[in-house]
């Protein structure tokens, strides 16, 4: 019973921390800073440091219409992956990590100046995960 109670308490603490992080008012700078690390760990091998990808194999994120202007599709691709392509789902990342890496790509390589520059917040990711009725 003690082990179970400890597990329950850990889960409650995780849920509280997640709620705290998703409700926080994140600045663009905070998301970009965190997103740069997430990108380096999860994205750079395919999309490259400069966001140019590998022509004919992995698409560029720099100048991408989706990254520039289609926030809902941008979230969907990271959450669902792209069927028939090498892009897998990254739904195992936390809401904060997903929001940060998407914001990082939307703010990097000239994308902020050429697109809508809109940030993605952890709350956007939580909203995406809600069941669609």
Model-inferred region functions:
Residues 60-115:
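Extracytoplasmic electron-transfer domains, predominantly the class I c-type cytochrome c fold
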Residues 55-59:
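Short acidic, glycine/proline-rich loop/turn micro-motifs
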Residues 1-30, 91, 95-96, 100-133:
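Flexible coil segments in periplasmic/lumen-exposed cytochrome c-class electron-transfer proteins
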Residues 28-54, 68-80:
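Sequence/structural segment immediately N-terminal to covalent heme-attachment motifs in c-type
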């Amino acid at each position: 019973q003690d082990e179970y109670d400890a597990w329950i308490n850990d889960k409650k603490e995780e849920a509280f921390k997640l709620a705290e992080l998703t409700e926080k008012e994140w600045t663009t700078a905070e998301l970009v800073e965190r997103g740069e690390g997430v990108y380096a760990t999860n994205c750079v091998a395919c999309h490259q440091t400069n966001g140019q990808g590998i022509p004919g194999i992995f698409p560029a994120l720099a100048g991408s219409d989706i990254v520039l202007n289609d926030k809902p599709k941008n979230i969907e691709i990271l959450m669902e992956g792209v069927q028939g392509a090498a892009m897998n789902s990254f739904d195992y990342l936390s809401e904060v990590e997903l929001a940060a890496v998407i914001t990082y790509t939307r703010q990097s390589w000239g994308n902020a100046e050429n697109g809508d520059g809109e940030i993605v917040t952890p709350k956007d990711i939580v909203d995406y995960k809600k069941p669609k009725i």
